[in-house]
Design a protein with these regions (language model features):
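A short, compositionally biased
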Residues: 1, 93-97, 116-121, 298-304, ...
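Switch/communication elements of ASCE P-loop NTPase nucleotide-binding domains
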Residues: 1-71, 302, 306-446, 455-458
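An N-terminal domain-start capping segment
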Residues: 1-15, 148-167, 285-308, 443
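Glycine-centered tight beta-turn/hairpin loop motif at sheet-sheet or coil-to-beta transitions
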Residues: 12, 104-108, 130, 312
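Short Pro/Gly-enriched beta-strand edge/turn motifs at strand-loop
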Residues: 80-84, 286-289, 383-387
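Electropositive, glycine-dotted interaction segments
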Residues: 110-270
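Extended helical coiled-coil dimerization/tether regions that scaffold
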Residues: 216-324, 447-448, 452-453, 457
Length: 458
């Protein structure tokens, strides 16, 4: 789980900003907190409110950049993806800093790094304990210092120690050490790297980033057409949200007649042929529809996802293409796998513009379902929004509500409602927010200039 996230000098964040999911001392809505892990309580959700272009999406991108650099790394010869605050000449020369405080496998870790386009300047991983911190590794590139003494103690055999020392020295200056550990088959050479595995696994399997145009787990959606248990779950949620859709079904179609450009067809076939299995498959979203594609005996076979609707005048059903459904229904198809994963536990979802294409009441119900059915699991839902109706203390605790602001000189900053304002637990926040009492809303200039502009059109 994510307990804290820190970002500095990234996109519109000039200064150090701290996002904390540690709960305040309030006793309301105890079900919004996880069970204590090593004496640490963590909030299960947080909503970031703010005006357009205020920095909300940059906040999500900041969380994503660490995941990207850990999992994908930087290609040999390329510069690191570096996006400093550009409205300050000083900041363009400074490093970006990204820090995660996470709880996983009953331990608390701090993983962070500072970097620029040319190098990872600092990188460290610590286990945070009550009495003292344990440095698992740390590096400072410019001083050519790399401390892996803790890992060497855990792996005292000469060949293991030699391999770890070699790996540390061989880590390129534009690459994170954590990425090197992940990308090399280190388990064949080193026996005890549980701490590294835990943190890498958190980035790989727990942290999920979803942007407005990001489909989530399309394969699960297609699998739901054939898997009875998934089909039942999808159908129940689609009916619960009153979409008019009763389920999903796959029908065979001719891949060659889908209108896919020849170069894309060749690329798909090449990708599928790289699979080591006898029957390779993948998903394809094309022309507003979703397909399951297989490579069988060198030929691409395709199945199209259809939605099932009951006819009003008999017991038969009608099949619709996904492209025939509303934007809201299509977006809900992305969220149903998310909901199922949240309830199962072990996931940290960070969603940008969660309300996109969905009615506010539906979003509120998704959040309510999450709180109700995830009491005993360690999942988190963090999202950005400018939907004011969600700023509601019947839905959230005060310490779950965050406000994103951008100054007149383009600097974004954020803060938590309970730290910024002394509001009663029963105060209706929406009207105060819309009236600009908390900031984080659009600020308009005087109309003098546009009045002159519009007058020229008459």
């Amino acid at each position: 789980m994510l307990q804290q996230f820190i970002v500095e000098n990234f996109l519109s964040f000039k200064n150090r900003e701290i996002f904390s999911l540690q709960p305040s001392k309030g006793t309301l809505k105890k079900e919004h907190k996880t069970e204590s892990i090593k004496g640490q309580w963590v909030l299960k959700s947080a909503a970031m409110f703010g005006a357009n272009a205020g920095g909300k999406s940059n906040f999500v991108k900041a969380i994503e950049i660490g995941k990207k650099l850990v999992l994908r790394g930087t290609r040999t010869g390329d510069l690191i993806d570096f996006y400093p605050f550009r409205l300050s000449s000083e900041n363009k020369k400074k490093d970006t800093t990204i820090i995660y405080h996470i709880l996983c496998d009953n331990k608390k870790y701090e993983y962070g790094f500072s970097y620029n386009a040319e190098q990872i300047s600092f990188e460290w991983l610590k286990q945070i304990n009550k009495s003292n911190d344990c440095i698992i590794f740390q590096r400072e590139t410019e001083k050519s210092e790399f401390d892996i003494s803790y890992l060497l103690k855990l792996n005292p055999k000469e060949e293991e120690s030699q391999f770890l020392s070699f790996l540390a020295k061989a880590t390129p200056q534009r690459q994170l050490f954590l990425h090197e550990v992940m990308s090399r088959n280190i388990h064949e050479n080193v026996s005890n790297i549980k701490d590294l595995d835990s943190v890498i696994n958190w980035f790989v399997n727990s942290l999920k980033i979803i942007f407005p145009d990001t489909p989530y787990k399309q394969g699960v959606l297609l699998k739901a057409a054939d898997d009875n248990e998934l089909k039942r779950g999808f159908g129940a949620l689609l009916r619960y949200f009153n979409t008019g859709v009763d389920g999903v079904k796959l029908i065979e179609v001719q891949f060659e007649k889908l209108g896919i450009p020849q170069d894309l067809q060749r690329a798909i076939k090449t990708d599928l042929s790289k699979s080591n299995t006898d029957e390779a498959f993948g998903t394809l979203r094309f022309d507003d529809n979703l397909y399951l594609i297989n490579l069988i005996d060198g030929e691409i076979k395709a199945k199209k996802l259809m939605t099932v609707h009951k006819k009003i005048d008999d017991t038969d059903v009608e099949l619709f293409s996904l492209g025939d459904e509303s934007d809201g229904t299509k977006r809900l198809f992305d969220y149903i796998p998310l909901i199922l994963d949240l309830i199962q536990g072990g996931k940290v979802f960070v969603v940008d513009e969660m309300e996109r294409s969905l009615h506010p009441a539906l979003i509120q119900q998704i959040i309510t379902l999450f709180y109700k059915y995830s009491k005993d699991v360690s999942s988190q839902l963090i999202f950005t929004t400018h939907e004011s109706s969600l700023m509601n203390q019947k839905v959230f605790r005060k310490d779950e509500i965050w406000l994103m602001r951008k100054s007149s000189n383009g600097i974004s900053s954020f803060g938590r409602m309970d730290n910024l304002y002394n509001v009663r637990f029963d105060k209706m926040l929406q009207n105060s927010y819309l009236n600009g009492e908390y900031g984080a809303t659009p600020i308009f200039e005087t109309e003098e200039e546009i009045s002159k502009l519009f007058s020229t059109f008459k």
